[in-house]
């Protein structure tokens, strides 16, 4: 379906507009100076704060903004819980505490070598060839496999998981039928896996969460299915998008790439800068009480597009915000969110991104964009390259 063209980004923005999808940064820069809190009647009314302080204010305000709807969609579906990301206080804290043990630094350390092995096997497939798609052949494969192992699922299910992610996070924004079909399929899939573990428990996250309790009571089936769906979707798409954006940058900036090849110790610092500059995740909040943020009134019932990527490009917060400085010293970016919903998987994501870069640069120090092919980007909640054709060597 053809979408009506945007007439004015301040009063009629559309985050699915091809210009926004392809290169949102100039649009955000313009809004930050001209209209720091934009509004559109599309999607039944949405606000877009573009300054760090306003994004932060909304993220921390759980009295006036709810997380029960975290994606701006054309037609709001029935409420689909995915605790803790869709939970408000007081339910949020116990739901988050259930997942935290699996994502501590010590817990993630155990997954580092298996992640290196995954990266090495993937690189074996295209090392020595003239080129590859750094998104499809590499970035999109890593988190799928890592999360599958954590959940106790076959790595071979990757295509199925990628299909669901596309349907839920992209196609489902404007097609509620596609969304609800995918949600039903994920629920049925996870229910079957839960049933298997009742008779054959395993050392995996599905088994652990199946036994979880809150205040001494087993969590509900809806809670369990929602939490597993969250781990699958949020644990895969966000990280592969971040990894892909790193390679998109390095394929165009040989000076940065060579610095990292010559000084691998700089990679973790560079990862933080890539996360700042190319943060993948934009969340949403629902206005539940009339309130004013940044001098702009927010009306009950409308949505807020909570863009951590836009906040990370605010020059009031980050000097040279539009420059990628891979050895940036002070970098309090918001790539993993702000407030109570800050991403619990940040340790895992950082590890995967760092390992993905280390293993690739060790074996493929030279690569650049394929001038005969086109980079394409995802649209909607998570931004990252969907296709990233590169030439090797």
Regions found by a protein language model. Give the residues of each.
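Cytochrome P450
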Residues: 1-393
